[in-house]
Amino acid sequence: MMSFVSLLLVGILFHATQAEQLTKCEVFRELKDLKGYGGVSLPEWVCTTFHTSGYDTQAIVQNNDSTEYGLFQINNKIWCKDDQNPHSSDICNISCDKFLDDDLTDDIMCVKKILDKVGINYWLAHKALCSEKLDQWLCEKL
């Protein structure tokens, strides 16, 4: 009985940790509200988020003086606030940990502000890896 409970717990924990790792098609569907916004296509977003966070909604990257959060790797120096950077400009008026859940609504709202202020080049992966040959980033299962 104890081994069954252990296996059940491992299964639940494994599933819970996998929940934030999205697939290409899930990202394609989730980001439909960004289609064409700022002149950026959905395949460009799918490519950019893959190279930025690996489709991981809980990705956190610590830099020397800042941290980037979530699927879009939104920075705490300018766009959101956290304990590490209490003097953030917080342009998106949001706590950075909100970018670590599976609800991408607030992430997308902030992404639109980033696009309006600085454009797609905020995401370095876009220009280097996601501005051409985008067929591989399409999802046929819509």
UniProtKB/Swiss-Prot annotation:
Ca(2+) binds at K98, D101, D103, D106, D107. Residues 1-19 form the signal peptide. Disulfide bonds join C25-C139, C47-C130, C80-C96, C92-C110. CDD domains: LYZ_LA. GO terms for cellular component: extracellular region. GO terms for molecular function: calcium ion binding; lactose synthase activity; lysozyme activity. SUPFAM superfamilies: Lysozyme-like (SSF53955). Glycans are attached at N64, N93. This is Alpha-lactalbumin. It comes from Bos mutus grunniens (Wild yak). The lineage of its organism: Eukaryota, Metazoa, Chordata, Craniata, Vertebrata.
